[in-house]
């Protein structure tokens, strides 16, 4: 839709180029769905069609896919990886020797991007800003994430049992049912269903404890009319900056105190401040930077 550039997607279940099944592999304290061994003929057909190949999280493609070296590549790095991972990746990338432009979505992903290129470019994640949204003034808490330690569903579970929040509804988008949870579980909804859930809630809790590089769901939640309350992870503070409402990560006492104090404030004004802060992630503003990379590299 931009500058008459035609784009197609090569990936699992893509309508353009379906690369086949994925494997769910534990990685970086989570579970990643990875196309480790894509359909080789379809992959090469997709690459042959393109002038520029834009790859998100290039580690697996660079190591396992045997990419042709006669193409223009742009690599976008999202993950916040520890020093051990980045040390080995830097060595491996020197062996692979595929040149390309390296992009990172946040400061937390910078060290990841530098393993491939010493001068990466910052282009944040982006969404289409909803111009006609207002704060959802409802008593609904929302959690989004897998039931794994770093997503910290446990705090959400504990909140659902608190007497002081018995007038609130608790809803979670996650990957499995939770026994004795005092709320509603949505198991792996599709994008349309997810959007409806966001628009029907009002308070999004990002309770993550580590290994986050950006936090796109924070922006999605605000863009759907939710106020966001999050742990004080660097990645989250980079996204929301002064508009953020933060508690000390891993401290349930801090979360309870913050919620109590926040609910004494004007939630509509707090949401408006957050909504104003996410304007810098508007796709219309940021996609132009990728277009320049496509055309000039």
Which residues make up each language-model segment?
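Short hydrophobic beta-strand element within catalytic cores of glycosyltransferases
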Residues: 227-230
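Short His-centered aromatic/hydrophobic patch
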Residues: 55-61, 77-80
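Conserved active-site histidine-acidic residue motif and adjacent donor-binding/catalytic loop
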Residues: 37, 175-176, 184-198, 209-211, ...
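Conserved donor-binding/catalytic core segment of Leloir-type glycosyltransferases
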Residues: 133-151, 157-161, 171
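Conserved acidic donor-binding segment of nucleotide-sugar-dependent glycosyltransferases
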Residues: 244-253, 260-265
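Donor nucleotide-sugar binding/catalytic pocket of nucleotide-sugar-dependent glycosyltransferases
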Residues: 97-132
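Membrane-proximal helix-turn-helix segments that form the acceptor-binding/catalytic region
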Residues: 80-102
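A charged, aromatic-enriched C-terminal amphipathic alpha-helix characteristic of glycosyltransferases
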Residues: 131, 264-297
